[in-house]
Amino acid sequence: MNVVKLMGGLGNQLFQYAFGQHVQEVTGRPVRYNTSWYNVERTPPRPYRLNKFEMVVGAISYDKYKIVKEKDSLASLASMDCRHFYGYWQDPRFYNEILLERLRNEFHVKQEFWTKEFTEWYEYIKLSKNAIALHVRRGDYLHHPDHLVLTFRYYQKALAYMQAIKADPEIFVFSDDIEWCKEQFEDVHFIELPEDYLQFELMRACKHFIIANSTFSWWAAFLAYGATVIAPNQWNKTRLNGSEIHERNMLSPPWMYINLL
């Protein structure tokens, strides 16, 4: 049996779930997901969210296990009865086209969790000719030494490019600091739903994307068909302890990357 540890926010949970599905395909053994990380209160809160989506996440049951970290080789695992994977696994090379298509279907919020306000926004966005999701990540990034907070200049460049190539663009702003966004942006729609998973579903409904250095908007853009995606060319403030490899993985899709310098 394969056991994948779930931890972090929604974007990280999606990466860990997808990696588990990849491991299941490669090994031919079932995957289970360890959700114990969410049994502890954290600041800021990072609730378990995969139960809101269309995928089926199996519970775990094991007595002995070997922890496998991201730096370890997967080649020597065949003889282990129970393998426990601990990491974020943020690498799109894990997903072949068949798995990616399945993830596109599974990474939708179950309709039983849709609210009236969400449904109204969803229907409006789907009718928009060129709905563009713009994601601003601030929040915990403001107080973390390694996280890079994107400047308003980045978004100005991205918006100028989108407005030059898309007819009648309609901008929908998603953020964990919506008040800051209201001070910066004009002639846009501000999405203020409290549930992150519903914001993610609305973001997926958009046709094009201006993403932040965040797994949340990365996934919304990565799952889209034929979208124009603008992303920052730098993911982290520092490039230490393997972060340059992580950054290269996150910036591997064929998108337009804006130089932050």
Q: Where do the protein language model's features map onto the residues?
A:
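Secretory-pathway luminal glycosyltransferase catalytic domains
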Residues: 36-166, 251-254
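Short hydrophobic beta-strand segments
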Residues: 1-6, 30-34, 129-142, 172-173, ...
